[in-house]
């Protein structure tokens, strides 16, 4: 992996020199698509966790050079929009966002970039919105710390009816459109839909 990172950096530096020679001052993006092969078959594996690790390394190098960065991340080797697709996309994109990646190109791709799936694109959009929420992090302003409300409510109290909560409830937490959060009985009454079915309704 480390050698691949060296190669990525060498390619970025070479391209940067050529770009600046051709057109001085041209803005740069540290954009690479490093990946690994499955050593059992030689197959291209953009869904491998090592691809995510390489993107983290490239993001750190981009920070070192003070340029924006991004690339294809959140890809999967899964042929269908299933659990493998979800965990490969989720693991690598979360790692990338936490390492400071600026741009993700990930929408709707399956089967090592060979297939596009509309439902996967909708699910990837929801993942992207979740990642945006993660990147937003915490707001430690006096108002958001709500120390006065905590003191007022006291131990074991309820916050749901407090104006402070009501004013912020739609902004504080991400509200998904595809992920199901209903209790089981309501979920069953609505047709027991999985994420794929919910996504297809939104296509």
Model regions: which residues?
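Glycine-rich anion/phosphate-binding loop at the beta-strand->alpha-helix junction
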Residues: 1-127
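Catalytic-core signal marking the mid-to-C-terminal active-site face
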Residues: 119-203
